[in-house]
C-alpha cells in the first residue's frame, strides 16, 4: 500500500469526543484500484474513521487526503458537491428519498452536481446504472416497494452515477440476506476490476472482506492493530485480534490436551498450494501421525487459500523434519501454545 501519490492518505489521525479518544494516531494509505477492508469489534472506531474520510466529521488532529481533497483546507473552500463527484459514501440504510422513484433518486445527484447536463444525458447515465445493477425493471418503483437488496443496489447506483474515484461503504451488507449480499459484492468487485474504482469497505462480515478486499486494516479500541494484504493477514496473522476476527483458532484453543510428543499447528496454504495434497507425504512410513482438527479453503478475490489446524504427533526431531518439509514447500506453519 505504498505509493508516492496514493488516492487516500491518512497521517496521525486522532478523534476525541469529550475525554474519550475514538481514534488514536491512525496512519495508512490506499493506492488506486485497491479495496481496503476495515474490520474490528463493535466500538473499535471503524465507522468513525470512515466518516472522517468522507469529511462528514472533523478529526481532532491529523491529516486526510482523498481523491485530491485535503481536510487541512479551509472548510468553506471544499464544495460538498465537487467532493461528492469524486468520493461517494454508501451507508447501511441506503439514504433513498421515499417520495422519489428509483430513477428519480439516481438522477437527483446528477441534477444537483451538473446543472448544465442535458435531460437526455442524465437519462442515459441513470439507465446505464440501472442496467448495471439489474434494477431497470424497478426504475419507476418507490423505495417502499423495494426489497432490502434492491434498496442497497439503488444506493450503489446513486453512488456510481457520477463516476467517482472512491467508494466508501459502511456496513452496506449487514442487513441483507446471503443472496443479496452475494449480488452486492459481485457488483462491487466488478466495479473495481472493470472501472478501477478504489474502495474502502467497513464490515463485520469476514466472508465479504475475503471476497472483496486486497488489503485489510484491523482496528481495536481506536488503534490500528494490524494492516496488510488480506490474504497474508488471513494466513499469517500477527495479532490475536486478527486471529479472533478471522475465526481461525476457536477449535484449537483450550480443547486439546496434548502431551510432550504432540503439538498443535496451524498450516496456511498460499495460492497454488491450497489444492495440493501434502499431508499424505508426511505420514508415509508411520513415524509421525496427523490429526486434523479443522480446515477450510477460502476464496480471496477468487484465489483459493487454505488452512488446517492439526495435531502433529511423534518424536520432536521427526516433527521438526515434517515442519521443515512443509515450510520448504511454501506452507506457513504456526504453533499454538497450550492454553492455561
Swiss-Prot record:
Keywords: Amino-acid transport, ATP-binding, Cell inner membrane, Cell membrane, Membrane, Nucleotide-binding, Translocase, Transport. It is an enzyme of class 7 (translocase). Its main location: membrane. It comes from the Bacteria. It catalyses: L-methionine(out) + ATP + H2O = L-methionine(in) + ADP + phosphate + H(+); D-methionine(out) + ATP + H2O = D-methionine(in) + ADP + phosphate + H(+). Its EC number is 7.4.2.11. It is a peripheral membrane protein. Residues 8-246 form the ABC transporter domain. PROSITE patterns: ABC_TRANSPORTER_1, ABC_TRANSPORTER_2, METN. ATP binds at residues 40-47. It is found in: Cell inner membrane. One of its GO terms (cellular component) is plasma membrane. Signal peptide: none annotated. InterPro entries: AAA+_ATPase, ABC_transporter-like_ATP-bd, ABC_transporter-like_CS, ACT-like_dom_sf, MetN_ABC_transporter-like, NIL_domain, P-loop_NTPase. The complex is composed of two ATP-binding proteins (MetN), two transmembrane proteins (MetI) and a solute-binding protein (MetQ). Part of the ABC transporter complex MetNIQ involved in methionine import. Responsible for energy coupling to the transport system. Belongs to the ABC transporter superfamily. Methionine importer (TC 3.A.1.24) family. This is Methionine import ATP-binding protein MetN. The gene is metN.
Amino acid at each position: 500500500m505504498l505509493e508516492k501519490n496514493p488516492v487516500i492518505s491518512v497521517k496521525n489521525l486522532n478523534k476525541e469526543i469529550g475525554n474519550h479518544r475514538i481514534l488514536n494516531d491512525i496512519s495508512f494509505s490506499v493506492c488506486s484500484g485497491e479495496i481496503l477492508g476495515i474490520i474490528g469489534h463493535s466500538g473499535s472506531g471503524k465507522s468513525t474513521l470512515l466518516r472522517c474520510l468522507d469529511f462528514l466529521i472533523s478529526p481532532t488532529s491529523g491529516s486526510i487526503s482523498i481523491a485530491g481533497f485535503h481536510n487541512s483546507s479551509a472548510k468553506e473552500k471544499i464544495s460538498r458537491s465537487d467532493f461528492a463527484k469524486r468520493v461517494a459514501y454508501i451507508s447501511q440504510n441506503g439514504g433513498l428519498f421515499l417520495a422519489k422513484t428509483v430513477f428519480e433518486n439516481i438522477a437527483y445527484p446528477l441534477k444537483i452536481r451538473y446543472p448544465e447536463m442535458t435531460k437526455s444525458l442524465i437519462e442515459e447515465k441513470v439507465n446505464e446504472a440501472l442496467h448495471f445493477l439489474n434494477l431497470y425493471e424497478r426504475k419507476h418503483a418507490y423505495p417502499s416497494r423495494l426489497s432490502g437488496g434492491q434498496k442497497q443496489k439503488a444506493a450503489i447506483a446513486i453512488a456510481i452515477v457520477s463516476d467517482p474515484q472512491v467508494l466508501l461503504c459502511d456496513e452496506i451488507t449487514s442487513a441483507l440476506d446471503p443472496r443479496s449480499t452475494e449480488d452486492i459484492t459481485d457488483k462491487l468487485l466488478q466495479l473495481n476490476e472493470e472501472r478501477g474504482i478504489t474502495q474502502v469497505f467497513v464490515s463485520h462480515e469476514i466472508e465479504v472482506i475475503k471476497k472483496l478486499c486486497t488489503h485489510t486494516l484491523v482496528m481495536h479500541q481506536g488503534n490500528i492493530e494490524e494492516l496488510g494484504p488480506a490474504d497474508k493477514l488471513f494466513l499469517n496473522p500477527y495479532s490475536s485480534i486478527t486471529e479472533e476476527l478471522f475465526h481461525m483458532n476457536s477449535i484449537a484453543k483450550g480443547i486439546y490436551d496434548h502431551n510432550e510428543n504432540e503439538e498443535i499447528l496451524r498450516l496456511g496454504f498460499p495460492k497454488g498450494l491450497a489444492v495440493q495434497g501434502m499431508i499424505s507425504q508426511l505420514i508415509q512410513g508411520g513415524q509421525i501421525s496427523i490429526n486434523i482438527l479443522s480446515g477450510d479453503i477460502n476464496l480471496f478475490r477468487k484465489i483459493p487459500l487454505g488452512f488446517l489446524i492439526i495435531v502433529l504427533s511423534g518424536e520432536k526431531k521427526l516433527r521438526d523434519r515434517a515442519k521443515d518439509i512443509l515450510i520448504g514447500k511454501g506452507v506457513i506453519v504456526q504453533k499454538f501454545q497450550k492454553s492455561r
